[in-house]
Each structure stands twice: as C-alpha cells, then as structure tokens.
Amino acid sequence: MDHAGLIVRRARTEELAACADLYVRVLRETFTWQPPERHQAADFLRAARVEEVYVAIEAGRIVGLAAFYRPQNFLHSLYVTDRGRGLGKALLDHVSAVADGPLSLKCQVANRRAQDFYRREGFACVEAGADNGVAWLRFARG
C-alpha cells in the first residue's frame, strides 16, 4: 500500500467537528444493524475531551481518525472513509507507537470486518461482554 502523501498526526481542536462528522457518517454506514440516530456527533465530541484524537490526512482532507484513551492504553475509536487502503493500519500503527504499552480495544460482536482486521494486526480476543444489550469483544495485543 502506498502511503505517500498520507499524514497521521494529532487532531487540532478546530478539526474535531470534522472528525465528529466522519465518525457519525462511518458509523451509520457500517453499523447497519443499529438505528442511525443512535450515532451522534455529540458522543464523539464528549469523548474527545478526555481522549487523544489522531487523524489521517490525505490531499488536505481527513480520511480517518483514531481516538485513544491513554490512561488505559485503550483504542476507543478507529474509523476510515475508505476501507482496504491501509488507512486503518496507518492510524493503528501510529497510536501503537505513541502508546505507553500494549493496546486494548472493544469491538462489537456484529462487526466481523473489524474483528478480522484486528486479528490480522496481532490482536487476540481476551474478554466478551455486553453493554446496554450490545454484545462486544475486548481485544488486546501484547
């Protein structure tokens, strides 16, 4: 995958609204088993107050984001506009490089594509549970 021209860096405050829009758009396109109104920009912006948000920039536009909660080395969000181009891997590699230790994350059981991605990247399922009726798997990479 050619990443020439792709920049991954910490999001600027003035970019958070665009990140929230990308978050909502990708969730609504991907999580088709949930009502679209469940995904709100306000949820992302609330979490961004305590998380580090990283963006992938290509040709001057945000094409992906990762939200990272440093106290737990927890990857809270990883969303890209185009799948299969290495954007998610670039963001994951960047967050892994700035983390203080091994990453963990949760993935909805219904999101098989994400599970496959994380397994390819060396993550293993270490826990299963549910919140508000939504089943999830916790993945960790040592």
Predicted features along the sequence, with ranges:
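Alpha-helical interaction/dimerization surfaces of two-component signaling modules
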Residues: 22-26, 98, 117, 121
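Conserved N-terminal entry element of GNAT/NAT acetyltransferase domains
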Residues: 1-14, 139-142
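Glycine-/small-residue-rich active-site loops that bind phosphorylated ligands and cofactors
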Residues: 83-84, 110
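Short beta-strand element of the conserved SAM-dependent methyltransferase core
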Residues: 54-56, 135-141
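Conserved GNAT acetyl-CoA-binding A-motif
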Residues: 98-110
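Conserved active-site alpha-helix within GNAT-family acetyltransferase domains
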Residues: 89, 93, 110-136
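Acetyl-CoA-dependent GNAT
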Residues: 10-83, 89-94, 129
